[in-house]
Each structure stands twice: as C-alpha cells, then as structure tokens.
UniProtKB/Swiss-Prot annotation:
Species of origin: Schizosaccharomyces pombe (strain 972 / ATCC 24843) (Fission yeast)
Protein name: Decaprenyl-diphosphate synthase subunit 2
Biological pathway: Cofactor biosynthesis; ubiquinone biosynthesis
Gene encoding the protein: dlp1
Subunit annotation: Heterotetramer of 2 dps1 and 2 dlp1 subunits.
GO biological process: isoprenoid biosynthetic process; ubiquinone biosynthetic process
InterPro entries: Isoprenoid_synthase_dom_sf
Function of the protein: Supplies decaprenyl diphosphate, the precursor for the side chain of the isoprenoid quinones ubiquinone-10.
Subcellular location: Mitochondrion
Length: 294
C-alpha cells in the first residue's frame, strides 16, 4: 500500500496521470482521489497539503544538519519514510475539516489552523513510528539518536499545539501521545497481564485518527452531534485499518470472524458520515472506509 504523497503533493497536476496508473478501487487510487477532491474543492486545502510536505522535508534537512549527516539517520527514519500511512492523518484532518464545516466558507486564518492541526498529527505519527521501531538489537548510538529525533518531533508538535490556542484541542492531542505510549507498553505485556487486546488496539490504532477528526470538527465550532460523528468515523476507520493489516489466519473460522468484524467496523465508520452534507469531501471519506474491506 505504498503511497507517493510527498512527490504528489509538490506536483498536484500529477494526480490525474497517477490515477490512470492505479487499479480503480485500490488503496492508493482512493487516497489519490481524496487529494484530488481537496485540490478541486479549495485552493487553500491543496496549498496546505503541499506546504505540509515541504515543511516535513525541511525538518528532515534540519535534523541531518544537526547530526552532521549521520548515516544512521536514514536507518532511523526509514520506517516512517516507507510507511503506507505517511501523511494519511493530515489528509483525514483536511477532509474532515471540509466535511464538518458549518455555515460560511472558512477564512484564511481558519485554513492556517487546519494546517497546524494537520502538521501536529503528522509529527506525532512520525515520532511514534520512530520510537516503536527502536529495538534491543540496535547500537547505543542508534537508540540514542532515534530517541532524540522522536522526542524532537514531539516537541515540535507541542509548539504547534500551543499556537492553536485551543485548550480542548491541546488536551485531546496531548492525550493521543499518552495513548500511543500506553498502547506500546500494553502490546509488550503478556496475556492477561496489563491491557486487553481490544484496549491496546484502540490506543495504538484508533484514538489517533479519531481524535484528529474530532479536533478538525472542534476547529469548525461544530455541534456535539457532529463532533461525535467525526470521532466515531476516525475510531472505526482506525480499527478497520488495524484489522485489515492483521496477518491472515489459516483457521477458516477465525478468518471469517475477522472478516465479519472488519465489515462491522467499516459500516460503523460509514454510518457516522450520515450527518454530513453530500459533498465531495464526505464521498472521499466514504470511499476511504470502503477501500479498507476490499
């Protein structure tokens, strides 16, 4: 499920040609279409995605400079750079910010707040991937460098949160970091000790997209009803993505059970969108959910 976000967002005109190369209904084609929706729907949304990509590239260049182009840095950041979910959370934020908007079109100032929130989600996601890929087999230098890089990205996310000047969003997104750490510890514990498997999955895979979507709605001053719908869409989408990536069981009964659960998650995500107006952003979110179960 590799997804050429970074190169694509610097050249929005390439969307059509890339789509022609992708299998219709595939994960990559669905996400490419979603980017296209944002590009058509508003020049500002398209610009925000492009700016975010350039800023992440610039951040990587900064870290390279500080570490004297340490060759270990490439190894440390490789899991993030190769991640199929790179820039996925910012895309969710921008789609949900469009789907949940109430009343007049957003101002330029509000678009900038969308960008800050999108950047926060990507910084947290990048830091988490770098941290969870730290292994005992790595050298002390690798471990120290990976820890520092991940911590630096979390620090940058904290600064962006402060600039949003929204206490509710600061608390929610800070709790995402705590959720990811708690989920990581839970996954390392055995059997009945520690967290249940369901709770661990929620912490590791579902709360990040759920709370990112919720915060996009909060920026729009949406009603609690809309806020709940945004949260539920992100939660069930996260759960379905985690289950879809689970290794296929050789047991037919287990496989059927997992498929049934996956379909339920996808249907729950889609039903959450029923409260939104029928616009392209909503349709893009619907297609993203549908693509998970294919």
């Amino acid at each position: 499920m590799s997804f050429p976000f970074a190169s694509l967002l610097k050249r929005p005109s390439a969307i059509s040609s890339l789509l022609s190369l992708k299998k219709p209904g595939s994960w990559s084609s669905i996400l490419l279409k979603a980017v296209g929706v944002l590009s058509r729907d508003s020049r500002w949304h398209s610009d925000l995605l492009k700016m975010l990509t350039e800023e992440m590239d610039s951040l990587n260049g900064q870290i390279n400079t500080w570490t004297d182009n340490n060759p270990l840095l490439d190894e440390i950041t490789k899991p993030y750079r190769k991640s199929s979910t790179r820039f996925f959370h910012p895309l969710l934020v921008l789609l949900m910010s469009r789907a949940s908007v109430n009343g007049d079109p957003p101002s330029q100032q509000l678009f900038q707040r969308y960008k800050q929130l999108a950047r926060v989600t990507e910084l947290i996601h990048a830091a988490n991937i770098i941290h969870i890929n730290i292994g005992e087999e790595q050298s002390n230098e690798q471990i120290k460098l990976a820890t520092l890089v991940g911590d630096y990205l979390l620090g940058k996310a904290s600064v962006d949160l402060a600039h949003l000047e929204n206490n509710a969003i600061t608390e929610i997104m800070a709790s995402v970091i705590a959720n990811l750490v708690e989920g990581h510890f839970g996954s390392r514990q055995n059997g009945s000790v520690g967290l249940s498997n369901e709770r661990t999955i929620l912490l590791q895979s579902a709360f990040m997209p759920a709370k990112a979507c919720l915060c996009a709605s909060i920026l729009n001053n949406s009603s609690q009803y809309i806020n709940d719908a945004c949260f539920n869409y992100g939660k069930f989408l996260g759960l379905s993505l985690q289950l879809a990536h689970k290794p296929v069981s050789p047991d037919a009964q287990v496989l059927q059970k997992n498929n049934d659960i996956l379909k339920t998650y996808v249907e729950n995500a889609k039903s959450s969108l029923s409260v939104f107006p029928d616009i392209e952003a909503k349709q893009a979110l619907m297609e993203i959910a549908n693509s998970v179960s294919k």
